[in-house]
A protein has these predicted regions:
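Extended beta-strand/beta-hairpin segments
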Residues: 2-95, 105-195
């Protein structure tokens, strides 16, 4: 075995060119958005109806059907006696909130003609179920003591506007979010057996 060191014949040079590519999220139709806004302004009492059909598979796993979409699967984690095959109901609620906030941020940014390159919504919710769904737990608890007790949302948003403008867009979208307002405000709720 030779102990001679090999000398390189020429120095190795690496040239790296960095190119920053800025892409924007797929836009929505601004003209359509403005027409929708006009419709709401001209008829502020207008309402739509969302319909969902939920079918229990067994244990706590259920399938919720919405239009022609694939079913939304809901389950509970193992420590709550589910199979942990899908998000829990509270996580689905937070998912709906995140989706609604992201839609609102997109709409407000489009209205203000700000191009966004990223929206990520991070949510946490402190939820209580001491009554064990009413199945013999802390039955003295009242509705305000059950369910979500606090929700925290952080939004990562990037676009072609200063941070202050992006924050204004997020706050505006939150203020007018149908799902956020459903969670913040008491709403009439009724339940009965189907015919």
């Amino acid at each position: 075995m030779s102990t001679d060191l090999l000398e390189p014949s020429a120095p190795i040079t690496t040239i790296t060119t960095v190119t920053t590519v800025h892409t924007h999220l797929r836009p929505i139709d601004r003209d359509g958005l403005m027409a929708f806004a006009d419709k709401g302004r001209n008829n502020p009492a207008s309402r739509g109806t969302n319909k969902v059909h939920t079918v229990m598979e067994g244990q706590y796993r259920s399938l919720s059907y919405v239009g022609n979409h694939a079913p939304v699967v809901v389950d509970e984690p193992l420590h709550l006696f589910g199979q942990d095959t899908a998000p829990a109901p509270g996580e689905i609620v937070l998912s709906g909130l995140g989706g609604c906030l992201a839609v609102g941020i997109t709409a407000v940014a489009t209205w203000k003609q700000v191009k966004l390159s990223k929206i990520e919504v991070f949510m946490e919710g402190d939820i209580g179920n001491p009554a064990a769904w009413g199945a013999g737990g802390a039955l003295q608890k009242t509705p305000p003591e059950m369910g979500f007790q606090a929700i925290r949302v952080k939004v990562l948003v990037e676009g072609d506007a200063p941070r202050e403008v992006l924050d204004e867009i997020v706050q505006h979208a939150n203020f007018y979010s149908p799902v956020a307002n459903s969670m913040r405000n008491p709403i009439p709720f009724e339940i009965s057996l189907a015919d």
